[in-house]
């Protein structure tokens, strides 16, 4: 197949209509050299200008020769080239992470809106087979996407519908590590996939079709559940078990750093179905937070000293704390405040958040704040943000949610002042 034939195939997909500056990832192998020659030949038709990004991994004697050739080619054709040198302990994952971080930096610094890679149809089939062998979720059988968001723009794979054998054979370098059976992809490419083809000559096309159908199925599910308030427990639990399963899967996909095992997924689903309020650790400082009416996955941010500090409000000196303004006043007739706390002492009032063992005196008995919050069915966030008012070491009030709980005064107490409280957001 000629580059003209390839151009005729991909021009209908309008990959580059929104782009002017395109960065090409070039290793020096046959696939990326095909991509470089193709995009260079059709720059005018595609209305783009191109640049080359190359990573010298320094793992083979040929690495420097590849870099030198690409620099010479770029100079001859007046194409900008950007080169990085891999650092650190080498592994497939580390090298891939380094490459894409480098590509992202160049896109941002040099104002490229698209990164283009040379993945083709055979890469897609290999990827699907690898994921099947690993036991990946259905969602991941959708395989490699032709276009996806990346850095400041998009990552485009224009050859993804073209097989390797359909590509021309330009001058290129051979990476002999591609023959090493130490790498899973190489075992799939040279052994497992050929075995499948011996059973079914159309195995590659079948795997690609499976990928396409999986993608359509997931898109249909997303379209049908779009706008569903699944964070609300009543809405989530109103769905069938099958829909709940895929809703949670879809939600977890929004947390790329949170790769959990299937057993952990099943545990999360079970916890949500139980509807028991609480904070449930997952991994990597993420947790599942179940409130009275909803659930959310969030990253746990350690409380700072500022969050934990207490403040003291003295007679005649207003103070802001926890989203409220507190005013300690001897004017017992002042009106128009959100909350009014009677004070039977002129000693300063300490404002703080709850602590283990806190109790509020309610007359003939006292109650732990923990039990008070449970009985009031307050959310975990409301409990964490609750404000405790203390005078002379005794809790005199608690603000939690939209409720205020007061210490029961004795019959001998005489009101000497009031604590006026107003929400700052109204001011």
Curated annotation (Swiss-Prot):
Binding locations of ATP: 27-32
Cross-referenced InterPro entries: Lysidine-tRNA-synth_C (IPR012796), Rossmann-like_a/b/a_fold (IPR014729), TilS/TtcA_N (IPR011063), tRNA_Ile_lys_synt (IPR012094), tRNA_Ile_lys_synt_N (IPR012795)
Gene Ontology cellular component annotations, sorted alphabetically: cytoplasm
Organism listed in the record: Streptococcus equi subsp. zooepidemicus (strain MGCS10565)
Lineage: Bacteria, Bacillati, Bacillota, Bacilli, Lactobacillales
The organism's place on the tree of life at top rank: Bacteria
Task of the protein: Ligates lysine onto the cytidine present at position 34 of the AUA codon-specific tRNA(Ile) that contains the anticodon CAU, in an ATP-dependent manner. Cytidine is converted to lysidine, thus changing the amino acid specificity of the tRNA from methionine to isoleucine.
NCBIfam families recorded: lysidine_TilS_C, lysidine_TilS_N
Assigned keywords, A-Z: ATP-binding, Cytoplasm, Ligase, Nucleotide-binding, tRNA processing
SMART domains cross-referenced by the UniProt entry: TilS_C (SM00977)
Domain notes: The N-terminal region contains the highly conserved SGGXDS motif, predicted to be a P-loop motif involved in ATP binding.
Keyword ATP-binding: yes
Annotated family: Belongs to the tRNA(Ile)-lysidine synthase family.
CDD domains: TilS_N (cd01992)
Keyword hit for tRNA-binding: no
Entry-linked Gene3D superfamilies: HUPs
EC number in record: 6.3.4.19
Subcellular location: Cytoplasm
Name the record gives this protein: tRNA(Ile)-lysidine synthase
Protein's GO biological process: tRNA modification
Stored Pfam families: ATP_bind_3
Top EC class of this enzyme: ligase
One GO molecular-function entry: ATP binding
Catalysed reaction, written as an equation: cytidine(34) in tRNA(Ile2) + L-lysine + ATP = lysidine(34) in tRNA(Ile2) + AMP + diphosphate + H(+)
Family matches, as PANTHER family: TRNA(ILE)-LYSIDINE SYNTHASE-RELATED
